[in-house]
Amino acid sequence: MRDKVILLVEDNPDDEALTLRALKKNDIQNQVIVARDGAQALHYLFGTTGEHEEHAPGVVPQLVLLDLKLPRVDGLEVLRRIRADERTRLLPVVILTSSREQRDLVEGYGCGANSYIRKPVDFGQFVEAVRQLGLYWLVLNETPYAGA
């Protein structure tokens, strides 16, 4: 599980810290690349500006954890671009958001999300949600990008 890179797209520093803490608490030791807005996520995935020097062009993460309400480029547009590009169209994308809006849920799946998880307010419940997410997407699930 350790060699699979996770791209966390999250603009809220508190939610970023909670997500990283929940991953660590569940012994998910994968490298996590953090993009703090939609434009950074697209730059990481498609290598357009070199903002992420640790990223080798053409290397696709095993999983994207995507918030919806992002600056510069919103999460749904990031998802649309992921699905529109041949290099990333099969990339697992889990929307991890605090949005309670039904239209976000429907539009997220309509744009090609693989999963939609509402962030629990309780940290213990959030840790458990991250544990289950990690178990499924990083251990049980197989993607075309394995070993990439």
Regions found by a protein language model. Name each.
Residues R2-D3, I28-Q29, V59-L63, R87-P92:
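His-Asp phosphorelay/catalytic-motif detector in bacterial-type signaling
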Residues D67, T97:
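Active-site residues of response regulator receiver
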Residues I117-R118:
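Residues at the ends of beta-strands that form strand-to-helix hinge/output surfaces
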